Every structure is written in C-alpha cells, then in structure tokens.
C-alpha cells in the first residue's frame, strides 16, 4: 500500500508541476518538479524514496534514451559526428583530468582517484534536462542536434570513466592500457548488442504479423518492453546498456521508416502511448531528483566536520570550472575548424552560440544515480573516503547547472524570440501548411482497399483547407471573436436542452448524448484545451488502442431515434441563433452572421437532410470520422515534434493547438 501511495504522490507532483508552469511559465517545468520533490521530502513525515542506481537506470534512462535514439534525425547526427565525438569523448576525458585535479587540490581529503570519479560522473550532460529546457527557448537547430547527439553518447563514456576511477580507488590499481581497451570493448559491444537485439525483436514482430497477429495493443506492449530487454541483456553481457538502447532506438527508427502503409494505425497508437509514457518518466526523473536532495544535504549540514559555507563554495567552484572548460572546448574547436577550412565552409565562431552550448551542459539524474552507486567500503574494508561529500557535491552541481540554464538560456535566445515575433503570422501559416501536409501524408500511407474511398474524400477535404490557408491570411482578432460567439451559441443550446428536460419534452437519459457533445464542444472552444491530456484526447487514445468503439455509442441512447434527435437538434440550434442575434452589434456583426450561417445549415440538415441511418452513408461517415480523428492526432504529434525540435516557439504552438481544437470541434459538431 505504501508503494501505491508513493506512486500516486509522484504522479500528483508531476501534474501539479505542469499546472504551476501555466501560471509561472518563465520557470521551466524540470525546475518546478525538482522544487516540488525537495518540498515534499523536506518534511519529516514527507515522501522519502531511496535511489537504487541499477533500478533507476533500467526504469528511466533506458526507455528515455531509446526514444531519443528513435526520434533524433540520423542524417543530421552523421553530419555532426566529429563535433559530437569531440564533446562526448574528448570533453568527457578532459573534464575528468582537469576537474579531477581541481577537486583534489581544493579538497585534499578526497583522494585523486576518487576526485577523478567525481569529475567523471559530473561529465555527462543530461539529454532529458537539455530537451526539457531547450523546448522553452528558440535554440538554433544545429546546436540542438549537437546537444542531442552529445547527450546520447556521453552518458556511456562518463559512466565507463567513472567505473574505472572507482575501481582504482577501491583496489588502488589502475592501467591506462587496460582501461582504454575495456572502454572500446564496452562501447562497441553495447552498440553491436543493441543493433543485433533490435534486429531480432523487429523480425519477431514481423513474424507475428505474418501469422495474422496484428493486434495493436500486443505490438505496443512489445515496443514498451524492447528498451528494458535490450538494456538488461547488454548489462548482463558486460557491455554498455546505455549505448545498446541508443542503438536499439536508431534501429527501430529505421524500421519505422520502412513500415508498411497498412500499419499506419499502429504508428499512431504507438506514438500516443509513448507520448504518455515519456511525459510521466520525464517528470518522475526530476521529482525523484528533488526527493534525494534534502536527505543528501542533511548528512553534510549536520556533520560538524564540514563548514556549510565552505562546501557550498566547493560546489560553486566546481560548477564554474565545468562551465569554463566547456566554453573553451567549444570555442577552440569552432575556431580551429573555422581556420582549418580557410573560413569558407564554417561560420565564424560567435560568442552567443558558444554561450548557449556552454550553459546547455546541464547535469541531471544520471550524475546523481552514478554518485549513489559509489560503494560504502574499499577493498580492505575501510570506508570509502568522503562518500557523503561526493554525493552532496554532485547534487549541488546538478542544481547549479539547472538553475543557470533556466535563467541564462532564455536571455541568450531573447534576440531570436524578437525576430520570430516580427513575422509571427507568416510562421504560423507556414507551420499550418506543414501540419496539413503531414495529415495528408498519414492518410496516403494508411490507404488500403477497404478505406480508399473514405481516404480520398478526406484527403480532398484537407487539400481544401490547405488552399484556404494559402489564399487568405489568418486574422487572430476575428478568430478570437468567432470562438467567443460560438461558445455563446453552445451555452444557449445547453440552456435550451435543459429547458426541454425540465418541461419533460425529452427524457434526461435520452438527452445524455447531446449533453456530452455540448460539453466536449465547450471544452474545445474554451480554455480547457490548454490541459494537455483532456478527456477528448483520452477517449481518442482508448479508441486507437481498440478499447473503445464509437459505434457502441451510436447504437445507444437518443441516437437510436433519428426523428427525435433531429427535432431536439433543430430546437437547440434555433435557440443558439436567437441568442446570437440578441448579442449582435456593429463590431461583431460579420462574425455573428458567419456563425448563424453555420447553425442555419444544421437546421436545414435536420429538416431536409438524408436519412441519418442510411446504412452506406452511416458506414462511410463513421470510417471518415475515425480516419479524421487519426489525422488530427497526427497533426497534434507534429506540433509537439516541431516544438521539441525548436522549429516553433511556445506562442506558435499555442496558436496551432487552438487551430486543431477548432478542427476537432467541427468533427464533434457534425457527429
């Protein structure tokens, strides 16, 4: 029961962090989550979870890095292979040497091998933290790709260096030749293991499909299990589990690119399932990180052997050392390449870009998990020197780098924000065209003999939307006014429906379907769409996982009586028209007429439209609606991808989500 309650508290903290971020958007979600974790763990009766490093790596790091390997563009990483290797290998080992000697010089009680171990575990940047922080600023695309590539590789190099430094501290023996050979063996073995295991897992899934086992839920479960299987197998063999899951993610991305068209439904369901899993895992990483800090700090602050201000100074000096070393490494490499290419193919080094790279080097959960894996005793049975201090210093550096990135990255990218604001309308139009094209592409890929007619009709609808966007500019003021008037009409319909119930002209049970429909429309036209996982989206996800069928809804309630439905819908639409006319003025007259025209079409369909239950039309409309919801979800995923890749900022993503919610509202209105 305690474990269950702890999980509920953690999930509640994740949800709370996103709610808080809506009110204080200038504070990044990861920092809020760390703060909430600290707050909950600070109370004696609060939540205290001991960090098991092995469990942490397999439960959190494996699926997160697997997903990063899947979604990071392979061609762009290959083009940046030289700088990525220089950061993931060269900078890591430079950090171990420079920071290690600095730590030992500053704190003589920490032996040199242990200082190297601390420097090694501080060398990897946290790809999860980098992605979370960079999404709120306009990070240049090239820098973002470089950071992603670095984050995928330097966890392994840092942990291997940490492992050998710990071994040297525990045993007192170290061989540079043996360490170098082992590093190559562990790294290459991890990559090879990830590729081979992924290949066999993919072949196994193809084999199941050839047997006719195309159940979406089963294949998604196999996908979820994949990173855990790869990581555990690689670690059992003795190679890098981290590099194995990265290689596995890249291999699965290649398989996804080649996936047959009739598996588009699986792609959509898989994408939405992983979005939820990653949302929870990302949040848990930072909340658990915050939960560890009070306990770690208490051990040091209550120990009279340590001066509190002195250990805080140690943290600041180590952080400064890491930042200076990273800046010099990036600047010198950039300047050297610029000079070597005779200033033709490489841009001149810029201070702003170098500073962005420097402060994006956030340390995170991998660092703390590695620090907690330090053994308690040496080979002779004596305590590991300054173990608690090393863990405290690691936690302090994590906090410092996280705060520095949160404060400085938005300032360094402010100029780009202003440039984007100048042509906001143009960028929104461009993004909307890209979204509609992605929906058309999804419909084409998912087309088969069974849905060909429906897919072509829907593709034509999206092409019409695309032409409309290209013809006339988007007017935000008019659009906000239209949303307000439509919301007013929906409320008038709700009031009319309630009146019919009270007058006993309609049974309340029969009116349930329309009440639900009006409620969903009200959510989409109001600010409720800001909540990322709304009821509507949850129903869509269940539908894609084949746990909910829309035809079950059609066959129940008021929709069984076609004439009754038409009469009620006509009366509510007429009430909406009357209410809108009463609130019409010179300022909103044009928009009111537009919305009234929509309601007049509804009234006309109720009076003269074709039979609602004509079998062919019903089947066609149902298939079209299902495909349309899939296309809408594809667009939502594309918005998130554009946002995470830094191609659009928060404001543009907000406008695009409003646009998609309007599309979904139209779908609900016409069903």
UniProtKB/Swiss-Prot annotation:
Biological process per Gene Ontology, one example term: sodium ion import across plasma membrane
Pfam family, one: Na_H_Exchanger
Its membrane topology: Multi-pass membrane protein
Keyword annotations of the record: Cell membrane, Ion transport, Lithium, Membrane, Potassium, Potassium transport, Sodium, Sodium transport, Transmembrane, Transmembrane helix, Transport
Protein family: Belongs to the monovalent cation:proton antiporter 1 (CPA1) transporter (TC 2.A.36) family. Nhak (TC 2.A.36.3.2) subfamily.
InterPro entries linked: Cation/H_exchanger_CPA1, Cation/H_exchanger_CPA1_bac, Cation/H_exchanger_TM
Protein name: Sodium, potassium, lithium and rubidium/H(+) antiporter
Annotated TM spans: 7-29, 46-66, 83-103, 110-130, 156-176, 182-202, 228-248, 276-296, 315-335, 364-384, 389-409
Entry's Gene Ontology molecular function annotations: potassium:proton antiporter activity; sodium:proton antiporter activity
One GO term describing the cellular component: plasma membrane
Record's function text: Transporter involved in the efflux of sodium, potassium, lithium and rubidium.
Localization annotation: Cell membrane
